[in-house]
Amino acid sequence: MSVLTPLLLRGLTGSARRLPVLRAQVHSKPPREKLGTMDVAIGLTSCFVCFLLPSGWVLSHLETYKKRE
């Protein structure tokens, strides 16, 4: 590495440090009604059944798919 490398890198990163970081101004209202335990349980169960169960079945039967000709 040359002696000028740190100076060149400092010059490149110095302009990036001065750029402002834009943040999104996202605000929301409080929920109209609070979710109960049963609502959360039904939501998590439906996500499990719809997404994780079929993918788990395919992964467990992967060897049978490979053996077919």
Swiss-Prot record:
Protein name: Cytochrome c oxidase subunit 8A, mitochondrial
Function: Component of the cytochrome c oxidase, the last enzyme in the mitochondrial electron transport chain which drives oxidative phosphorylation. The respiratory chain contains 3 multisubunit complexes succinate dehydrogenase (complex II, CII), ubiquinol-cytochrome c oxidoreductase (cytochrome b-c1 complex, complex III, CIII) and cytochrome c oxidase (complex IV, CIV), that cooperate to transfer electrons derived from NADH and succinate to molecular oxygen, creating an electrochemical gradient over the inner membrane that drives transmembrane transport and the ATP synthase.
Spans traversing the lipid bilayer: 37-60
Taxon lineage: Eukaryota, Metazoa, Chordata, Craniata, Vertebrata
Mitochondrial matrix face residues: 26-36
Complexes and interactors: Component of the cytochrome c oxidase (complex IV, CIV), a multisubunit enzyme composed of 14 subunits. The complex is composed of a catalytic core of 3 subunits MT-CO1, MT-CO2 and MT-CO3, encoded in the mitochondrial DNA, and 11 supernumerary subunits COX4I, COX5A, COX5B, COX6A, COX6B, COX6C, COX7A, COX7B, COX7C, COX8 and NDUFA4, which are encoded in the nuclear genome.
Family: Belongs to the cytochrome c oxidase VIII family.
Record organism: Eulemur fulvus fulvus
UniProt topology in membrane: Single-pass membrane protein
An example Gene Ontology biological process: mitochondrial electron transport, cytochrome c to oxygen
Mitochondrial intermembrane side: 61-69
Primary location group: mitochondrion
GO CC terms, sorted: mitochondrial inner membrane; respiratory chain complex IV
